[in-house]
Curated annotation (Swiss-Prot):
Keywords on record: Cytoplasm, Ribosome biogenesis
GO terms for biological process, alphabetical: ribosomal small subunit assembly; translation
Taxonomic source organism: Cutibacterium acnes (strain DSM 16379 / KPA171202) (Propionibacterium acnes)
UniProt cross-references to Gene3D superfamilies, sorted A to Z: RimP-like superfamily, N-terminal
Gene of this entry: rimP
Protein name (database record): Ribosome maturation factor RimP
NCBIfam families documented for this protein: PRK00092.2-2 (NF000930)
């Protein structure tokens, strides 16, 4: 069975456990097939599904595939995961779930340019068409940064990827206050 048909089969199953089906891939792996299912959801903290939710979804997906016979008689391996931090943000809900996170944006190039502007910004607000960012101002100094807001149309975004932060700025600010 191809990924498109599996997507139609699995969407209601994933929805029943309160999550969203993000992607389904079927990849040959020797004599077996690898069925990769990527799920998403708000989770208990609003930032993605918990391990318990992923575990519950995995069990339901496995039962559905076995009961429906969708994979036929040939063996397969099921792999269910959340989107992961390096997966580009593509939907308005992805931006909403990453409010407060630092994201590297690459904008679509203007007509006369070969590549678009690339910059980092912390998501402050996210709507269906626009994301509001907190970005470092041009007159900012390395040891005492100054921030300003910037609105970006989602239609203008070529790529947006969450950046891993080992020392978040808001965590440092709260330490300095104490």
């Amino acid at each position: 069975m191809n990924a498109e048909r599996l997507t139609r089969l699995l969407e209601p199953v994933v929805s029943q456990v309160g999550l969203e089906l993000d992607r389904v891939d079927v990849v040959p792996a020797g004599r077996r097939r690898l069925v990769r299912v990527t799920i998403d959801g708000d989770g208990p903290d609003g930032h993605g599904p918990s391990l318990d939710e992923i575990s519950e979804a995995t069990a339901e997906i496995s039962h559905c595939l076995d009961d429906s016979g969708a994979m036929g008689e040939s063996p397969y391996t099921l792999e269910v995961s959340s989107r992961g931090v390096s997966t580009p943000l593509t939907q308005p809900r992805h931006y909403r779930r990453n409010i407060g996170h630092l994201v590297r944006f690459t904008l679509n190039p203007a007509e006369e340019q070969k590549s678009g502007e690339t910059f980092d910004g912390r998501i402050a607000e996210a709507g269906e068409e626009v994301v509001t960012l907190e970005v470092e101002a041009e007159n900012s100094k390395p040891h005492k940064p100054v921030y300003t807001t910037r609105e970006v149309q989602l239609a203008d975004v070529a790529k947006a990827v969450v950046q891993v932060e080992l020392n978040r700025r808001d965590a440092q600010a709260s330490k300095e206050e104490n």
